[in-house]
Amino acid sequence: MKVSYKKLWIMCAEREISKGELRKRAGVSSATFTKMRRNQEVALSVLLKIADVLECNAGDMMDFIKDEDYAHQNIDVDEVW
C-alpha cells in the first residue's frame, strides 16, 4: 500500500491556504512537506498537526492506495496548488 495526499492538496487549494502558510501554522519542516509532496509516509504526529490547523481528521487528507493502482492515482501537486 502507498499513501496519497491528493485530498490534502485539493483541500488546501479550495481553502486558498498556501504551502508556506500551512507549514508555518502546523509547525512542519520543509523537508517533511517535501516528503508529503512526493507522497511519502510521514509521522502521524505531523498529520495530526496539519489536521488541527485545517480542522479536519487525518483521514480527510489522505488515501491508501494499492501498489498496482498507485501510478494511476499520482498527481502533480503543482497542478492542484
Predicted regions span which residues?
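Residues within the helices of the helix-turn-helix
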Residues: 9, 20, 48, 59
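Short, charged recognition helix plus adjacent turn
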Residues: 10, 63-81
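Residue-level detection of the helix-turn-helix DNA-binding "recognition helix"
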Residues: 13, 27, 38, 66
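The alpha-helix within a helix-turn-helix
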Residues: 12, 23, 37, 51
